[in-house]
Amino acid sequence: MWQGGIKMASLNVTDVIKELDISKSYLYKLIDKENILIPRSDTGRYFWDENTVEIIKRFLHIDGLQDKDDTDFLISKLGLKQSFINNRRYLGNKYSLSDFIRKTVDENCKGVNIVIDIFSGTGAVANTFKDKMLITNDLLYSNYISNYAWFEYEKYSSKKIIELIYDYNQVKTKENNYMRENFADTFFSADDCSKIGYIREDIEAKYKNKEINFKEYAILITSLLNAMDKIANTVGHYDAYRKNVDFEKKLVLNVLLPEETVNSNNICYNLDANKLIKSIRGDLLYLDPPYNSRQYCDAYHLLENVARWEKPEVYGVARKMDRTSLKSDYCMITATKAFEELIERADTKYILLSYNNMSDKGNDRSNAKILDEDIMRILSKKGKVTIFESNYKSFSTGKSDIKDNKERLFLCEVFSEEKKKMTSNTIVPFFFW
């Protein structure tokens, strides 16, 4: 007898992969790569017994597979690559400024234990504060799912993620699914569209069948979105695609293994920032709102479509879905009013606003929607304001190279009377008490 009480004489491949807790494709990959000698019948079928299983276990290091060394070993053996949170192109991404932001907070803010990143994008700045309790939020579901993957506290199986990524990379299909029907030979080749559609459908099915939890679901979707973005026939966004191109790059998913030591009280939201601010409280509110009229839901409509997987009708040359509910007030003439309401409702000790000096340096679409004098007027009513600057070259949708582009940090130390007033009016989740 062996674990589970299954007799060796009656073993089949299903019994073996269940005992080893690996996929069938990975089992055969391991046998082939390591030249593991397993007896075969005249028809080529493997004979499985206790000795064979123990031999394979030694190659797997099965008992310690969650350890980093063994995880790295498995990734290497399967010929996979690992990606990290900063490996994604994104408009306004602050990864290059993360050290500047963290240093500013560490040197000027006291008692910061809870950080709210309410326009979190793909999480570059939130990651800088991963030693704190994090509250992240973004209006785009594709960003919410990425933040959940990286920051929410939920156990997941590294081995399961690695094996599924390996399996997805082996997929070869020409099925006429939603992606192929709507996006073939636009942002991706027809075959890659089929592959994207197949993988996304499989992730959805596995979650609905409870084969993966929501953390694993989020990790797999984020890996797929990152892989798409890496090969997309664009200039970094999805407002348009280049015509008459050869699709040389093929879809390859990388492994994402978020840290499991994040704060157990972290929470990620997918809400309008001005609505969410009324029901949360923290020590530091970090703000990185859209600066100009370019809507993020327009620039990333395809990734948002795949993340949501509601399969809506698409239209126009760029094959966009309806994005009415995803439009941000911060990209319109309402930006200043929205910003003022957000600041008035903020219940924190400090507010840190990232805003560059583009108010009059770019074209009409690039120009900042909120003027410096309005920023100072609004923040000064809330507390004492100090400005910090850093030179910065941003990733944008345009081709212009604007000189003397600076990222400014407006740090507002909230007046004590403001803090007292807000504390009495804020609805706070249970874990804040």
What residue spans do the PLM features occupy?
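Polyanion-binding surface elements
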Residues: 2-26
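Major-groove DNA-recognition helix of helix-turn-helix-type DNA-binding domains
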Residues: 21-45
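A short, Lys/Arg-enriched interface patch at domain edges and termini
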Residues: 52-75
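S-adenosyl-L-methionine
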Residues: 72-109
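Conserved class I S-adenosyl-L-methionine
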Residues: 113-118
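Class I S-adenosyl-L-methionine-dependent methyltransferase module
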Residues: 133-135, 139-260, 297-332, 337
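Conserved Class I SAM-dependent methyltransferase catalytic core
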Residues: 329-382
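Class I S-adenosyl-L-methionine
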Residues: 372-376, 382-420, 427
